[in-house]
Design a protein with these regions (language model features):
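Short, polar/charged alpha-helical segment
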Residues: 35-57
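A bilobed periplasmic-binding-protein/Venus flytrap-type ligand-binding module shared by bacterial periplasmic
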Residues: 108-119, 221-236
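A conserved helix-loop-strand patch within extracytoplasmic ligand-binding domains
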Residues: 101-151
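Ligand-binding "clamshell"
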Residues: 89-101, 114-116, 188, 193, ...
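Beta->alpha turn/N-cap motifs
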Residues: 60-64, 79-87, 105, 178-179, ...
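Immediate post-signal peptide segment of exported/extracytoplasmic ligand-binding proteins
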Residues: 20-31, 49-51, 119-125
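Short helix-initiation/N-cap motifs at beta->coil->alpha
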Residues: 59-69, 156-184
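Ligand-binding clefts/hinges and TM-proximal coupling segments of bilobed small-molecule sensing domains
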Residues: 135-159, 242-268
């Protein structure tokens, strides 16, 4: 056998082996990780996918760390719970190789209170709860600045911390709480950053009753379907995302679950 033919056969064998592995990787059920805040519409999408011959398994997590670890390790194929700034920070902190695959929705977060009915009623020395992760905590601080309760250093932006506060005229005590627990903090604090979907699940307060909303014109905060880099060609994933984004049944569930406090991210 001449050398050229030997290498040609070797290359063909390698290609066949690679194709077999790729096919195996993209066979079986698509495993989707999420949290309680995004699960109900996904459950509807899973049911619709089954009708179309696509088997999808939904894995629900109770924190915001395990979903990324699970995608990185290959335990699940995709997760849905985070926006791009959170993902970028997670990649930097965890050494992950994760990328956004497609947009899902954006939620209208706000500042909530069970003790006061207007921002100007927040007392001097009052206690305010924001998220304790760097990115969503910054979002909370930006909301407080929008409410004119604090002023941040110019340019602090999406990575603001409490150290960036340059003016706090009401001497507010800002405490940092795990984001999924912010709704429960409302019994103890004067004001809290709130996520409508978690408020709805906890039944702590009407999600529509925020003293101030952030608004939906923030494309950076659109929640993303996130995968490990290199798996962009998974046909199961493309089909499932298409169902999530375009099925009338899923859209009806999104409307029912989030009400008017969300917007499809793929329309931005």
């Amino acid at each position: 056998m001449n050398i050229a033919r030997h290498f040609a056969l070797a290359a063909s064998a390698a290609l066949l082996a690679f194709s077999a592995v790729a096919a195996e990787n993209y066979s079986g059920p698509l495993k989707v990780g999420t949290t309680a805040a995004f699960a109900p519409p996904l459950e509807t999408a899973v049911a619709e996918a089954k009708k179309q011959g696509l088997n999808v398994e939904l894995v629900e997590f109770t924190d915001w760390t395990a979903p990324n670890v699970s995608v990185e390790n290959g335990d699940i194929d995709v997760n849905l719970f985070q926006h791009k700034p959170f993902l970028e920070n997670a990649n930097q902190q965890g050494g992950f190789h994760l990328v956004p695959f497609a947009p899902a929705i954006i939620n209208n977060i706000g500042l909530y209170s069970k003790k006061h009915t207007a921002i100007d009623q927040i007392p001097d020395g009052g206690t305010v709860a924001i998220a304790n992760d760097p990115i969503n905590g910054a979002r909370g601080l930006l909301l407080l600045q929008k409410a004119r309760l604090i002023t941040l250093k110019p340019g602090a932006g999406l990575k603001s911390t409490v150290d960036d506060i340059v003016s706090n005229p009401k001497h507010l005590k800002i405490i940092e709480v795990e984001a999924v627990q912010l709704s429960r903090s409302l019994d103890e604090v004067d004001l809290a950053q709130g996520y409508p979907h978690y408020l709805r699940l906890s039944k702590t307060i009407d999600p529509n009753s925020a003293l101030l909303f952030d608004g939906l014109e923030h494309p950076e905060y659109v929640i993303q379907f996130v995968i490990r880099d290199g798996h962009q060609n998974d046909p199961r994933l493309a089909k499932f995302v298409d169902i999530y984004q375009h099925s009338p049944v899923v859209r009806a569930k999104l409307d029912d679950f989030y009400g008017k406090l969300y917007q499809p991210g793929w329309s931005q």
